[in-house]
């Protein structure tokens, strides 16, 4: 018999943030690491293109703040979601694990938002 009042799951929201963070970490983050961490220090990228003044101007614009926010928050949600499910897979049952991991991700998201807004 089909339950006429099925319980709604909050898991799709967390899976969505996990998927978005995974895609961001796989596509966008390596490009930024390549540019800022490898090409710029080795002189393979024009230094004035990523000068302090230009980067500061970009990060203080709306699109720059959104980019910086997403660069921090999406991989954060992905990582904490992975940790939550890794604990479950290893049979290490954290009391209220969903609240611990997703709550920490939510708190760090708010902290990041405050930091990016006040930048």
UniProtKB/Swiss-Prot annotation:
Localization of this protein: Cell inner membrane
Keywords, ordered alphabetically: Cell inner membrane, Cell membrane, Membrane, Transmembrane, Transmembrane helix
GO cellular component, one term: plasma membrane
Function: Two distinct, membrane-bound, FAD-containing enzymes are responsible for the catalysis of fumarate and succinate interconversion; fumarate reductase is used in anaerobic growth, and succinate dehydrogenase is used in aerobic growth. Anchors the catalytic components of the fumarate reductase complex to the cell inner membrane, binds quinones.
Quaternary data: Part of an enzyme complex containing four subunits: a flavoprotein (FrdA), an iron-sulfur protein (FrdB), and two hydrophobic anchor proteins (FrdC and FrdD).
Protein family: Belongs to the FrdD family.
Protein name: Fumarate reductase subunit D
Gene label: frdD
């Amino acid at each position: 018999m089909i339950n006429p009042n099925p319980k709604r799951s909050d898991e799709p929201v967390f899976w969505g943030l996990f998927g978005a963070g995974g895609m961001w970490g796989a596509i966008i983050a390596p490009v930024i690491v390549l540019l800022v961490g490898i090409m710029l220090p080795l002189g393979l990228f024009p230094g004035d293109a990523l000068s302090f003044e230009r980067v500061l101007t970009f990060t203080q614009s709306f699109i720059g703040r959104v980019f910086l926010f997403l660069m921090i928050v999406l991989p954060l949600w992905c990582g904490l979601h992975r940790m939550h499910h890794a604990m479950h897979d290893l049979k290490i049952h954290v009391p209220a694990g969903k609240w611990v991991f997703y709550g920490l991700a939510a708190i760090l998201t708010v902290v990041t938002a405050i930091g990016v807004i006040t930048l």
